[in-house]
């Protein structure tokens, strides 16, 4: 099955790295440099809804948490799996993600791209929420 994956990160190198991983597996990937860019695309009439959004926490402008709050408030991409992909591994950040009903939280520094890909696929294919 082909999934539509949205990647949101201000680090262009990481965006490209993850995009290649998902594209090579046959998935449709769109990258965004920040939360505002993602929200603008989701609000645009006729935009295809993503199956998953991988969202960095710390970005210029809106944080990933603020972005997800706006998405929830406006019912944007309501059926998408939301996975935080961040270097922020503090328990308070993980708790914030849970409060916002994120489906997963991956710490970039301790996960190679193939692990990020595998966890995303697990969640998309009906895996339980990460704890």
Residue ranges and their predicted role:
Residues 2-13, 18-22, 53:
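Conserved acidic segment of CheY-like receiver
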Residues 31-52:
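Acidic, metal-coordinating helix/loop segments flanking the phosphotransfer/catalytic sites
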Residues 56, 86:
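Active-site residues of response regulator receiver
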Residues 44-48, 72-79, 100:
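Conserved phosphotransfer cores of two-component systems
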């Amino acid at each position: 099955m082909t999934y539509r994956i949205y990647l949101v990160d201000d680090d262009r190198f990481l965006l490209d790295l993850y995009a290649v991983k998902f594209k090579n597996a046959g998935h449709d990937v769109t990258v965004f440099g920040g939360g505002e860019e993602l929200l603008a695309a989701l609000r645009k009439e006729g935009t295809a809804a993503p199956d998953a959004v991988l969202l960095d926490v710390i970005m210029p402008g809106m944080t990933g948490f603020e972005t997800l709050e706006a998405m929830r408030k406006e019912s944007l991409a309501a059926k998408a799996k939301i996975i935080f992909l961040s270097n922020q591994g503090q328990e308070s950040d993980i708790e914030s993600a849970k409060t916002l009903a994120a489906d997963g939280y991956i710490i970039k520094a301790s996960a190679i791209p193939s692990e990020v890909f595998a966890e995303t696929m697990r969640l998309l294919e009906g895996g339980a929420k990460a704890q």
